[in-house]
């Protein structure tokens, strides 16, 4: 199993000020991708969590630097982005109806994966929840 160092991250704090700190590490699962973060959007949702002990940011883009053995849709070097949801079960009624944000088993920003955010060096995200960015689009946009 491969362990991924998340590098430097920016977390919320009780005062609401961002805290720069060392992120933890993650074990790369079979369908995970490691993203070296290039840019992050700032969303109003980030303001809701600024006093939480969690890595902030859920509108990230970057370059894939590692992939798990089951990943087929993206490869190392691909430019990708991700958002609020990190995973869902895929078999409940909500998922089947296209509402994976309502999945009772979902992992998403602010609820789970509190060590993963786009305000940092690296993120580990399930490959099914990243989106390729065409080369013609600058990552800053």
Please place each PLM-identified region on the residue numbering.
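Short structural boundary motif marking the start of a folded domain
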Residues: 2-10, 33
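Conserved Rossmann-like nucleotide-cofactor binding loop
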Residues: 43
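NAD(P)H dinucleotide-binding glycine-rich loop of Rossmann-like/cofactor-binding domains
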Residues: 89-141
């Amino acid at each position: 199993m491969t362990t991924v160092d998340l590098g430097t991250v920016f977390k919320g704090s009780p005062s609401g000020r961002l805290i720069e700190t060392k992120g933890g590490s993650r074990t790369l699962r079979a369908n995970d991708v490691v993203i070296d973060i290039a840019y992050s959007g700032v969303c109003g949702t980030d303001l809701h969590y600024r006093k939480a002990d969690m890595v902030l940011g859920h509108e990230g883009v970057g370059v894939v630097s590692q992939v798990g053995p089951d990943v087929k849709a993206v490869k190392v070097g691909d430019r990708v982005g991700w958002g609020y949801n990190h995973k869902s079960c895929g078999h409940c009624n909500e998922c089947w109806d296209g509402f994976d944000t309502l999945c009772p088993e979902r992992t998403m920003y602010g609820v789970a994966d509190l060590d993963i955010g786009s305000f940092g060096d690296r993120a580990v995200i399930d490959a099914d929840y990243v989106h390729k960015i065409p080369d013609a689009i600058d990552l800053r946009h």
